[in-house]
């Protein structure tokens, strides 16, 4: 690592810490030549392979801009979108892959978006999964309803078992 002050090609690591919720490492370094200290932040690279075969770095900003249109007119804040993008990136990085298809990024967006706002999820899924008919929308909506009912039934069972234990 070159010193940014004197361009000496050597430096010593003084301190290392996790940063950005564990997705990067912050290192405090000292130059043995000039004695000045500087900070570096190291992250693993994550490339998205587009349909054309061209790779580009993963971007939370692109995730947010892709989802923002689906969230227009919905009670979704910029903070919500930032948290969604962070969750998507964490899910992708947890797979351990250095490269991921753009299609997989879209799939990784669907889950967190569904938890955030079901209408925005339907809007995004209709474009991403290329809904072609009303039946496509109806099947997606019925799946959402079925899962919501199953979640309610599970919650009722859990509260019922808690009451019986009292």
Swiss-Prot record:
Its cofactor is Zn(2+). The gene is nrdR. Belongs to the NrdR family. It comes from Paenarthrobacter aurescens (strain TC1). The lineage of its organism: Bacteria, Bacillati, Actinomycetota, Actinomycetes, Micrococcales. GO terms for molecular function: ATP binding; DNA binding; zinc ion binding. A zinc finger (unnamed) spans 3-34. This is Transcriptional repressor NrdR. The keyword Disulfide bond does not apply. One of its GO terms (biological process) is negative regulation of DNA-templated transcription.
